[in-house]
Amino acid sequence: MKASHNITILLTASLLFISCKPKVVDVKPDEPTDPEKHETITLGGGCYWCVEAVFQQLDGVISATSGFMGGHIPNPSSEEIYSQTSGHVEVVQVVFDPDKISTPEILKWFWKAHNPTDPEGQGVDKGSIYMSHIFAHSPKQRELAETSKKEAQTNFDTPIVTTIRDAEEFYAAKEEDQDYYFRKKGENPYCPQQITPKLKKLGLDY
């Protein structure tokens, strides 16, 4: 779903070094090539640059689009999102081929790709916008998410705080924030400081 505004956030150089705070945008998520076959799940696991860099590498994933979901204000401005008044969460909308990678497999990567027990956000990115969420696109997917969460809990000493909700309207991030890590890892120190170690730990390309 397209956002109906075009807001530019001015980021200071120091903010780029330590946090993930981009802009809201008019970019529609990549359309599945076969809507009858492909499925969609929307995941929030901290800064969407990080989550996107993980899922776009997985075999069977058709597209991974950064954006926002879960708020109570339609067509939110950047100020409303990042002041945490709109209720939106940074997410990555993942379109995948279930014949190549299943929903439970997608979710296993999700649990490994972030710390779902952190109630304050992820790493240096703190606040409700960076908290752990799964937005299910069907009742079956929500059931699978609940089961996966219970299974994942056995790997953590503290409670998983991930919220599981039905998918809502998706607002894609600006084009400049899509495929961010692999385009900007040599320019923005946030990438080698925060994203590269995660990709190395997961055995993915970096």
For the regions a language model picked out, list residue spans one by one.
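Bacterial Sec-dependent N-terminal signal peptides
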Residues: 1-27
